[in-house]
């Protein structure tokens, strides 16, 4: 995902999407949650750096967020800062391997992956990915591998989580964005510049399929309903596409807001989410595997295009900042971005 240190195009689509034992929850929960999402609080975090992916550590009740050169950790019970992982240069994404009690960050600036202790946050080692500018990163507990998706080299690096060594490289034929796994050996990743989803085997590292996503353009965020085998991908042309995870067929599309960049899915409520840079959160209900409808458009704040979902509390987290007026255009920068106002970085807590 592209990230600007001042006005980021952040794609957190949702961190690890986990199936829940609550997936059979009744329609009353979905109806109540869908109709009442709102920004319950805004927490000013300040500090330096832009931002990119967010991910919720459900076991530790923490929210991890990339901040340009460091990775900030928030206690989701108090919304306060409880840790900061230093020296993650150009950090984009964060992933967790609960079975190993380890976490991982993808560091775009030096094309590396930092391995850290998930409990203490202490760094363990740094792995050079052999790809250029790792962006999204996910852990697959089926193969016990970490997958880092390299934006500039158009490939993925598979890392053996037990040994912290590179297990292989996977050419993707384009710029990868977010990815999800099903826990059974299959991984899906958006290929942004090709408007495709690639399907991978996490054991053999073979690319099994490339699926065109038309009418979806430039997909970024991606989420998965493991029960219905449906992918939710969000697109730059204000669409969410629902895709059959087994054959790649686009079964439905729904409108989102401008600047859509991140996606999430709550298995308990069957709600899918798209966070939009215009300052809205689109909430979609999955009625059946092939039908869905928009149930709410939640006002958030301009720039809040990256998000994470806590599937236990059903809370959505987004981040943004305040921005000043854009500088005057130049030949080199005909459309300059507005600068972020120092110390204005803010966490939005969006509750049902």
Predicted regions and their residues:
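Bacterial N-terminal signal peptides that target proteins for export
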Residues: 2-14
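Predominantly soluble domains enriched in secretory-pathway, periplasmic, or organellar proteins
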Residues: 24-352
């Amino acid at each position: 995902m592209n990230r600007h240190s001042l006005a980021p195009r952040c794609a957190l689509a949702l961190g690890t999407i986990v199936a829940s034992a609550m997936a059979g929850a009744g329609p009353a929960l979905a109806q109540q949650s869908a109709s009442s999402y709102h920004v319950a609080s805004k927490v000013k975090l300040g500090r330096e750096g832009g931002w990119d992916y967010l991910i919720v550590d459900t076991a530790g009740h923490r929210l991890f967020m990339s901040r340009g050169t460091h990775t900030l950790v928030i206690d989701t019970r108090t919304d306060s800062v409880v840790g900061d992982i230093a020296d993650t240069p150009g950090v984009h994404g964060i992933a967790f391997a609960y079975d190993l009690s380890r976490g991982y960050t993808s560091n775009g600036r030096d094309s590396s992956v930092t391995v850290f202790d998930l409990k203490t946050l202490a760094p363990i080692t740094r792995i050079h990915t052999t790809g250029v500018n790792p962006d999204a990163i996910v852990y697959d507990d089926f193969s016990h591998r970490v997958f880092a998706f390299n934006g500039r080299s158009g490939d993925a690096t598979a890392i053996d989580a037990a040994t912290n060594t590179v297990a292989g490289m996977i050419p993707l034929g384009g710029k990868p964005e977010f990815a999800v796994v099903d826990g059974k050996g299959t991984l899906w990743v958006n290929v942004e510049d090709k408007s495709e989803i690639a399907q991978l085997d996490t054991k053999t590292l073979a690319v099994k399929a490339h699926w065109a996503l038309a009418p979806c353009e430039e997909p970024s965020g991606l989420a998965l309903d493991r029960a219905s085998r449906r992918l939710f991908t969000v697109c730059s042309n204000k669409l969410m596409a629902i895709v059959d995870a087994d054959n790649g067929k686009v079964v439905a599309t729904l409108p989102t807001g401008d600047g859509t960049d991140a996606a999430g899915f709550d298995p308990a409520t069957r709600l899918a989410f798209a966070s939009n840079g215009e300052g809205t959160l689109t909430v979609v209900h999955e009625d059946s595997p092939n039908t869905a409808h928009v149930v709410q458009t939640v006002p958030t704040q301009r720039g809040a295009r990256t998000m994470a979902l806590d599937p236990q509390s059903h809370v959505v987290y987004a981040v943004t900042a305040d921005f000043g007026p854009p500088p005057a255009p130049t030949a080199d920068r005909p459309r300059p971005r507005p600068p972020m106002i120092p110390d204005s970085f803010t966490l939005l807590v969006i509750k049902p």
